[in-house]
Amino acid sequence: MNRNLCVVALALILLFPAASMAQSSVPDVPSKISVPAGHRLLFKYEARGVQIYKAVKNQSGKLDWTLEAPLANLFDGDREAGHHYDSPPSWEAADGSKVTKSGDAISAPAPDPEKDIPWLLVPVKAATDEVGIYSTVVFIQRLQTAGGNAPASAPKRVGTKVGSPYRAVYYFYGAGS
């Protein structure tokens, strides 16, 4: 009996620090891009890639850059964990499970908006029938962005595309506390 109690106590000691570490890794963000109550952090990945912009004519006939799609690799430390791409934006795990933007993203300016793309809260849904690690993801936050803004100079020709390098940290959330 005492041996079982010791095993349970040891398990609790080992679990509580892990739970508090997961909780402490949830970032502080502007309230408008906070994840709704009742959701928990599942994954955190660093993204490295480009934001692809395309030259289009605006309503006044001038050329502007418009975001076409992201193209990035997701990393868990040094391990490639997936990809972020397409329009509407999609995130695909190494196991083939995939989520896609399912509603309007909510945006908040990055701390240095002149250099860095905004922070986002994106509702997502499963995009495939593949059961995998993204199967239960319902929100993704894009935070800690660096770079990625459209070029400062106006485009010269309709249809021109350019990739603007960026980095970000993506936080994946599922239902449950």
Outline where the language-model segments fall.
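Bacterial N-terminal signal peptides
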Residues: 8-17
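Bacterial N-terminal signal peptides that target proteins for export
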Residues: 1-8
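Primary mode marks residue(s) on the alpha4-beta5-alpha5 output face of response regulator receiver
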Residues: 23-52, 59-177
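Sec/Tat signal peptide C-region and signal peptidase I cleavage site
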Residues: 18-22
